[in-house]
Amino acid sequence: MKQYKLVNNVLGWLTFLVAAFVYCSTIEPTASFWDCPEFITTGYKLEVGHPPGAPFFMLTANLFSQFASDPTQVAKMVNTMSALLSATTILFLFWSITHLARKLILKDWSEMTMGKLIAIEASGLVGALIYTFSDTFWFSAVEGEVYAYSSAFTAIVFWLILKWEDHADEPHSDRWLVLIAYMTGLSIGVHLLNLLCIPAIVLVYCYRRYPHIELKGSLLALLASFVIVAGVLYGVVPGIITVAGWFELLFVNQLGCPFNTGEIVYIILLVAIVIWAIYESYTDRNFKRQNLSFVLSVGMLGVPFRGMGWGAAIVGIIILAAIYFGLNYRKKIDKQFVPVVSARFKNTALLCACLCL
């Protein structure tokens, strides 16, 4: 096992070096004639790009632009960032391929032989290097666009769920899921494309937790993943702004407070309620209080609120009520009533939501 990990790590970094050398040798020396000049300029000057924006890309592009000796080299530095991030994509793609190949070839570590080791590593090398020199990926790797960055996040997030799959039976395995949520939150600051990893993550989670799952269960898991994607895309991302706007209108227009008072109150309440919910789900002492704090957290995050006005508020409250009654549902197992949604699941979901923000 140790020998495999050593070889796997060495060859993974070798593919990274090959990809980094190729991409850095073939980068655009200046700006390409499409969105790239906009991203390079907004990164260099920390300006606002076109909607929905890419703030995390701008910050890291600005960091790389500091290495430019003069303004004429800024574009080259940002293009170099894309090249290195694309090489990072190849690195994690290699490790993902070898992980999946190992699952196909080996049932147990005791079955490892030199021939199987070569087959696993060769699979990773062939797959990673084919992708390295593919036309579409190479094209995006050498210019200052968000797609190279987004690809790196996608590769890292998928590799992380495979790492979780290796450690799923350990007591603290949920930390990998929390890290995935954090990386997904960062990726939203680059491009929303990374949300498409969620269906794959949910399927890996379900197949690992429920190895005998059938077609119906797989379809339900896939449907749940679509709900999560929609919840993040149409719930959390615009929902926080919606609820914060309601607080601001209440405190400024109705109560006559100074500007930003409602926003400050909202942030304080949001942090306090989420911390309370995390504490309740962690201690698992009071079932009713645990569910109430969880539902309040979901509401404060704005997940069920879509649109503006009384209609959006009423629909959101109905959804929150349905979530609350769903959390209170228990099923009978071995003459005991057990909650369908465990405290551990709620705690992990809250931590993931916080880090995703």
Regions found by a protein language model. Give the residues of each.
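Start-transfer (signal-anchor) and selected internal transmembrane alpha helices
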Residues: 1-22, 88, 108-125, 324-357
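Transmembrane-helix motifs of polytopic, lipid-linked glycan transferases
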Residues: 13, 80-112, 156-160
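Aromatic- and kink-enriched transmembrane "portal" helix at the membrane-lumen/periplasm boundary
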Residues: 24, 71-79, 104-120, 124-151, ...
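Short hydrophobic/aromatic helix or loop-helix immediately within or flanking a transmembrane segment
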Residues: 45, 50-76, 80-84, 91
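Membrane-interface transmembrane helices that cradle and orient dolichyl/undecaprenyl
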Residues: 114, 118, 157-176, 203-214, ...
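Short hydrophobic alpha-helices at membrane interfaces in multi-pass membrane enzymes
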Residues: 122-125, 167-185, 214-227, 289-297
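Transmembrane-embedded, aromatic-rich helix segments that form part
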Residues: 153, 193-205, 238-240, 312-319
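Membrane-interfacial entry segments at the cytosolic side of transmembrane helices
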Residues: 172, 211-223, 255-265, 283-295, ...
